[in-house]
Structures are given as C-alpha cells and as structure tokens.
Amino acid sequence: MTSNETTAGALLPPLSCYASLVPYYDAGGITIYHGDSRKILPMLGRFDLLMTDPPYGIGFAAQPTTGGRKRGQKKEQWDDEAIEEWVLHQAMARADKRVIWGGNYYNLPAARCILSWYKPDAPPSMGNVEYAWTNLDQNSRQISRSIAATNPERLGHPTQKPLHVISWAIQQAGEAQTILDPLAGSGTTGHAAKNFGKRCVMIEREERYCEIAARRLAQEVLPFSSHNTKLSDSPSCSDQR
C-alpha cells in the first residue's frame, strides 16, 4: 500500500497537487486551510469520509427543529450569507462516506442511516436532539450524552459539537482513514481525527477559528474511549431527510 492509499480504497493525490495551497496549519497528518471552501474544494482530491457540522440556522430567523423547538443564535460575521448547498454537494462528491450534522436543513437525498445526539440536559431554549444525515449503509444510531459532561471546552463557535460526539460519529464510518471537513469551525473534526491517528483536511474561512483549531491540535493527543458511550439502535430511517 502506498503512503497515499487508504484502507478504505480511496486515493489522495500526491502532495504536489496542493502546491498552490498554503496551509494555515499542517502537522501530524492534520491540515487546515484558511479560505473559502468554494475556491479550495475544487483543488482537493478524494477522501474516505466527509464529516462536517455546518452553522445551519445561525444568523437567520430561527428555524423549527424536528422536536418543534427553534434553533437560532446570535448572528456572527462569518455567517453573513446562507451556507450554500453547493459547498456540501461539492464536498459530498469528494468523499465515499458522508456525515453531515444538520443535514435535515438542506436538500439532500433520503438517508437510511441517521445519527442522532440526544442531550438529556438540554435547556428549554434548544432542541434536545441533533441529527446527522449520512449515506452509511447501516441502521440508525443514537448517542446519549450530557452537554455539561461532554463539552467542558467551549471555544466560542455557535455550533461546536463535543469532541466525544464527533469521535463517536467518526467511528460509525468504520475504516475511513482520510477525512474532509470543509466547514471546520473550531476544528473538532481534526481534533478527533488526530486522536484516532487519521488524516484530515479542514477548511475554515474565519482566521480566528483557524487559530483556535491550530491551538487545539498543538495540544497532547488524548486517547478516545468508547466504553463510556451509550449507544442505541433505532429503526431504519429511510423516509427521513
């Protein structure tokens, strides 16, 4: 197996293909590009897994969640415009397996497998379940984790997921070794990928979040343990969006 080939069979292009891209951070198999995903994505090759958490519903009128509550946050400069579905579809075309948190807000195909994060201690102002659209060929899965217990590190990004939740979601993709996140935020995907020893390319257009992500990645790798995670199988969700 060559250095660019992954166990899942996807092939990343040689590093020379990225010659015109200057990374903000590049160490230990994790790369951050500071810029617009619409310009950077066409320059990238294929990946085993797309794992991303778009800032859906941020800076807009609050939108109803599946549970009837509304998701709305203070408008941020990085989200002056709606996140274009073009970015998601371009990223999807570059990955064999795809996990998109908040995918129910976008025009995506029906999914057999929905990943969900149940938050038993969620405040009344926010929904107690968040969903991820996937193309995974397996039954839907749910993780039940307290917000306070799993997210002691709040880094200022409105849609930041707990590291443990993103780590669990990556595990659902099996042997994926190369990961793409075109809407990286504070870099939780890269942090989880580093802990697993996987290669990850992230894109983020706000430099302050690139700085936060780079600082997190410079810290010592902490082993991820799955034995404290409560998992449950739920019925097939082929009719869900």
Feature locations, PLM:
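Class I S-adenosyl-L-methionine-dependent methyltransferase catalytic core
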Residues: M1-L180, S186-R241
